[in-house]
Curated annotation (Swiss-Prot):
Span of the signal peptide: 1-23
Pfam annotation, one family: Defensin_2
Cited SUPFAM superfamilies: Scorpion toxin-like
Keywords assigned: Antibiotic, Antimicrobial, Defensin, Disulfide bond, Fungicide, Host cell membrane, Host membrane, Immunity, Innate immunity, Lipid-binding, Membrane, Secreted, Signal
Protein's name according to its UniProt entry: Defensin Lucifensin
A Gene Ontology cellular-component term: extracellular space
Subcellular compartments: Secreted; Host cell membrane
Propeptide segments, given as residue ranges: 24-52
Processing after translation: The disulfide bonds are essential for antimicrobial activity.
Disulfide bonds: 55-82, 68-88, 72-90
Length: 92
Protein backbone atom coordinates (compact mmCIF):
# COMPACT_ATOMS: atom_id res chain seq x y z
CA UNK A 1 0.00 0.00 0.00
CA UNK A 2 2.82 2.38 0.85
CA UNK A 3 4.56 1.58 -2.43
CA UNK A 4 1.37 2.30 -4.35
CA UNK A 5 0.94 5.71 -2.67
CA UNK A 6 4.56 6.70 -3.33
CA UNK A 7 4.20 5.56 -6.94
CA UNK A 8 0.93 7.49 -7.40
CA UNK A 9 2.36 10.72 -5.97
CA UNK A 10 5.52 10.39 -8.06
CA UNK A 11 3.45 9.73 -11.18
CA UNK A 12 1.25 12.80 -10.54
CA UNK A 13 4.28 15.03 -9.99
CA UNK A 14 5.97 13.75 -13.14
CA UNK A 15 2.77 14.26 -15.13
CA UNK A 16 2.39 17.84 -13.92
CA UNK A 17 6.02 18.69 -14.75
CA UNK A 18 5.67 17.23 -18.24
CA UNK A 19 2.41 19.07 -18.90
CA UNK A 20 4.00 22.37 -17.77
CA UNK A 21 6.94 21.91 -20.09
CA UNK A 22 4.66 21.17 -23.06
CA UNK A 23 2.42 24.20 -22.55
CA UNK A 24 2.52 26.73 -25.37
CA UNK A 25 2.52 30.49 -24.76
CA UNK A 26 -0.63 32.39 -25.64
CA UNK A 27 -0.78 34.32 -28.87
CA UNK A 28 -0.04 38.02 -28.42
CA UNK A 29 -2.57 38.91 -31.11
CA UNK A 30 -5.45 37.26 -29.27
CA UNK A 31 -5.69 39.91 -26.51
CA UNK A 32 -4.22 42.91 -28.30
CA UNK A 33 -6.49 45.97 -28.49
CA UNK A 34 -5.55 48.36 -31.26
CA UNK A 35 -6.98 51.84 -31.62
CA UNK A 36 -10.01 53.78 -30.50
CA UNK A 37 -12.46 51.71 -32.55
CA UNK A 38 -11.42 48.55 -30.76
CA UNK A 39 -11.88 50.25 -27.39
CA UNK A 40 -15.44 51.21 -28.34
CA UNK A 41 -16.33 47.57 -29.01
CA UNK A 42 -15.28 46.43 -25.54
CA UNK A 43 -18.30 46.34 -23.24
CA UNK A 44 -17.85 47.96 -19.82
CA UNK A 45 -18.22 45.81 -16.73
CA UNK A 46 -21.39 46.44 -14.78
CA UNK A 47 -20.96 46.96 -11.06
CA UNK A 48 -23.82 47.15 -8.62
CA UNK A 49 -23.91 49.76 -5.89
CA UNK A 50 -25.15 48.43 -2.61
CA UNK A 51 -26.03 51.39 -0.41
CA UNK A 52 -27.19 49.19 2.46
CA UNK A 53 -23.97 47.26 2.99
CA UNK A 54 -22.74 49.32 5.93
CA UNK A 55 -25.99 49.21 7.88
CA UNK A 56 -27.37 45.79 6.87
CA UNK A 57 -24.26 43.64 7.10
CA UNK A 58 -23.02 45.08 10.37
CA UNK A 59 -26.41 45.31 12.11
CA UNK A 60 -25.97 41.91 13.76
CA UNK A 61 -22.74 42.96 15.44
CA UNK A 62 -24.27 46.07 17.06
CA UNK A 63 -21.95 48.57 15.35
CA UNK A 64 -24.24 49.69 12.54
CA UNK A 65 -24.39 53.41 13.37
CA UNK A 66 -20.69 53.74 14.16
CA UNK A 67 -19.74 51.89 10.96
CA UNK A 68 -21.95 54.26 8.98
CA UNK A 69 -20.41 57.27 10.73
CA UNK A 70 -16.90 56.00 9.96
CA UNK A 71 -17.90 55.43 6.33
CA UNK A 72 -19.18 59.00 6.07
CA UNK A 73 -16.07 60.43 7.76
CA UNK A 74 -13.88 58.63 5.23
CA UNK A 75 -15.92 60.24 2.45
CA UNK A 76 -15.24 63.69 3.92
CA UNK A 77 -18.60 64.30 5.60
CA UNK A 78 -19.23 65.18 9.26
CA UNK A 79 -20.68 61.78 10.16
CA UNK A 80 -23.79 59.76 9.47
CA UNK A 81 -26.51 57.43 10.73
CA UNK A 82 -28.58 54.47 9.55
CA UNK A 83 -32.18 55.39 8.77
CA UNK A 84 -35.24 53.13 9.13
CA UNK A 85 -34.69 51.50 5.73
CA UNK A 86 -31.09 50.51 6.69
CA UNK A 87 -29.51 53.08 4.39
CA UNK A 88 -26.49 55.05 5.55
CA UNK A 89 -27.31 58.78 5.48
CA UNK A 90 -24.29 61.10 5.64
CA UNK A 91 -24.44 64.59 7.16
CA UNK A 92 -22.96 67.47 5.19
Amino acid sequence: MKFFMVFAVTFCLALSFVSQSLALPADDEAHFVDGLEALKTIEPELHGRYKRATCDLLSGTGVKHSACAAHCLLRGNRGGYCNGRAICVCRN
